[in-house]
Amino acid sequence: MQSMTSSGASATTEQQGRVPLFSTDAAAPDGLTPAEQERYQRDGWLGVYPLLTPEGVSYTCQVRERVVRGFMAPEWLARSRDAKDLELRPWFKSMHAYVPTFYDITCHPAIVNRMVSILGPDVIAWGATLLRAPVGTTHRWHVDVEHRHWDGVSVFLGLENIEPRSTLKVISGSQRMPEPPQAYGIIHDDAQALTAVRAQVPESEIVPVPVRPGEFFIFAGRMWHGSHNSATLPRIAMIIHYSRPDAHIRVPTNWDAPINWHPARPPCVLVAGEDRAGVNRLVERPAGGRQA
């Protein structure tokens, strides 16, 4: 049984003394209020909350630029068959396990304490990636492959060029749908997605979440979400995934059924409580390697 180490609790410090990464407004509450818990159960998302300073946003984007090519991109996964492949070039959703800055963001109490209210006292971060959405890019309505196979909660942290035309969109209440959007085919059209959800959740609405750079929101892993960057600049955001330690975390190599799974065991970080299950590979804060 592994317990959370002090390194995970030290995330509020300035990043290596160089940059004030976290905003003084990034409160570390005891957890969600009763009203927030009720809203999460109803709507499936919460926020927005402050986290990073403007300098922290800029620094985080600089780190991404330096390290992103060292990770295995989605299009390469389909060609990977050997567990050793992800030792040489880690999964693109394992950035928090290799980059200290991303680890510290993932472990920040402003996020983790809220996760504990949703998931319980024991929480792991199993995925974190920084995505760049070029102008005109559409990410179809979907539920992440992983959260179709195990329960969890995600965080969307806005970094660069986040505005109403580029932010992530969610459909409120859609986490209660028995099927993900993928069961309805490839859906890019907002009206089509909303019609499908309203057939079972009549009060649902499409919400372009009003995140600004350095702010984050929380959403249920099974919530329908998508985006279309119709702004004039590329968007950069960080996506973080959390689950209970007894979830068996795996790496998918494709997006649509039937799902194929990579033989490698991805690294996970215990951000709260204890690992009472022992089914995942847990790692400590990275000291070097793909660092910044």
Residue ranges with predicted function:
Residues 2-25, 74-77, 216, 223-292:
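Non-heme Fe(II)/2-oxoglutarate
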Residues 2-43, 49-143, 148, 255, ...:
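Non-heme Fe(II)-dependent double-stranded beta-helix
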Residues 19-20, 163-224:
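Double-stranded beta-helix
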Residues 129-132, 143-145, 157-161, 170-172, ...:
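Short, structured patches in soluble enzyme cores that scaffold and shape functional sites
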Residues 133-135, 173-178, 241-247:
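Short edge-strand/loop segments of extracellular domains
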Residues 137-143, 152, 166-171, 179-183, ...:
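A short secondary-structure junction signal
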Residues 143-144, 192-202, 253-259:
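Short, surface-exposed loop/helix-turn segments at secondary-structure junctions
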Residues 148-164, 187, 210-211, 218, ...:
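Short, conserved beta-strand element in jelly-roll/cupin
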